[in-house]
Amino acid sequence: MEIDINGDPGTGNHFDDVHIRQVGNYSPNAKQAIFNTIHQDKAESRLACWFRKLNDEFEKDNKLKKKFDDIRRYKTKLPHTIGLDQKLKDGGFSEKAIEQARRLKQYFAKKSTKFQYYESAQRIDSYLFAKVCSSFDTYVMPLIEQATPLTDIKRAVYEQVILPIMNELNENGAADACLCYNEDDIFGMLYYLTGNCHINWTDYDV
């Protein structure tokens, strides 16, 4: 059995141009050779692994007695918290938009509470909380500090925070039969973090 390597990255090719094939019936006297292409399976992501484990934990009702510190810090209100309604009002949200945000926050909190003592659910929520906060601080907060119109800020929230997270969930959540988060849930997560003072919609340093 021999390995046949085609391509040479040193002659202008990319490493993607190099193909490794297993010769199935190599013989000096053979008139033809049968090649079997070797495929390397993509490693499972942490997120996909947690979704898969959550199904098993839920089926076996394998719960923890307490929450991890990583998730508790996001679910704990920070000092001097002024609440979701006031945060959004300060950010220029209408009463109708605030009511919708409050509703989405409650829907998310209800779903999250159902799975709050499953280890993998805590890890998933903690991971997503961190993604929401990081993306918001990176792409949205600078717009808020520049007094960008609210319509543009909301567009940035959707394009830079909600959509990337949904894409990651769609790519890694095929095994998810428990949380099944959708866009409303991620918005609810955003407003949940707002209510706990991890997200601001105006620059309070001004």
Region locations from a protein language model:
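Long, low-complexity, intrinsically disordered terminal regions
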Residues: R46-V206
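Long, low-complexity intrinsically disordered regions enriched in small/polar
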Residues: M1-S45
